[in-house]
Design a protein with these regions (language model features):
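Short, structured surface patches at the beginning of a domain
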Residues: 1-134
Length: 134
């Protein structure tokens, strides 16, 4: 594959209070990104619970906004947030900047379809003419 055509990936991991689990999650996501033919251009971890104390998450969003990331690798949605409004905001940011997200533990498309969140994201994508983030 042409080096310049390879998707640029960001790896993000967060399991509050579990450093070893967070690092294992990061490794699994990194291996999946490489297996999928991506160039890993960056990554971040957050060890804390809550929404405000997450510099790794904010760094990832800055890179997405700057157009430096094509795909984000996570193990599961809960690593981003357990709150639907935060996930919706995350998915919107990805769509606005043409990035996608891959979850290594399950099919993200199948998982979000189990919740109201999928319909909200699909309506937003249709209204704005954007590609879905998964």
């Amino acid at each position: 594959m042409d080096e310049q055509k390879r998707p640029r990936a960001w790896v993000y991991a967060r399991i509050p209070g579990d450093y070893d689990g967070t690092m294992n999650s990061y490794k699994v996501c990194s291996m999946q990104a490489l297996h999928d033919g991506c160039d890993i251009v960056g990554g971040s971890i957050d060890e804390r619970d809550g929404w405000l104390l997450r510099p790794g998450y904010r760094d990832m969003l800055r890179q997405i906004k700057a157009g430096k990331v094509d795909r984000v690798y996570i193990c599961r949605m809960r690593q981003v947030s357990g709150k639907e409004r935060h996930l919706y905001s995350f998915f919107k940011r990805l769509m606005q900047h043409g990035a996608q997200v891959t979850a290594t533990e399950y099919s993200l498309r199948d998982r979000v379809n189990m919740f109201r969140l999928a319909r909200r994201v699909e309506r937003y994508a249709t209204r704005k003419g954007l590609q879905l983030p998964w």
